[in-house]
From Swiss-Prot:
Disulfide bonds join 31-46, 38-51, 45-58. One of its GO terms (molecular function) is toxin activity. GO terms for cellular component: extracellular region. Probable ion channel inhibitor. SUPFAM superfamilies: omega toxin-like. Keywords: Disulfide bond, Ion channel impairing toxin, Knottin, Secreted, Signal, Toxin. This is U10-theraphotoxin-Cg1a 1. Its main location: secreted. It is found in: Secreted. Expressed by the venom gland. Residues 1-21 form the signal peptide. Residues 22-29 form a propeptide.
Length: 66
């Protein structure tokens, strides 16, 4: 029982560390990808994406958008 609890705790700690590292990698980007927060104080959207005025995240460009 103690061993399985330790495995669960170490597994959760590993998952937390990996997600934190992925988040650091995302914040290091120069531009925002799909569903990335954009707007004032945030990085601009990458080419091929526009900042949605309603939701304030990067969405794919469509022919009807300006």
């Amino acid at each position: 029982m103690k061993t399985s609890v330790l495995f669960v705790i170490f597994g959760l700690a590993l998952l937390f560390c990996l997600s934190f590292a992925a988040e650091l990698e995302d914040t290091g980007r120069q531009c925002g990808e799909f569903m990335w927060k954009c707007g004032a104080g945030k990085p601009t959207c990458c080419s091929g994406y526009d900042c949605s005025p309603t939701w304030k995240w990067c969405v794919l460009k469509s022919p009807g958008r300006r």
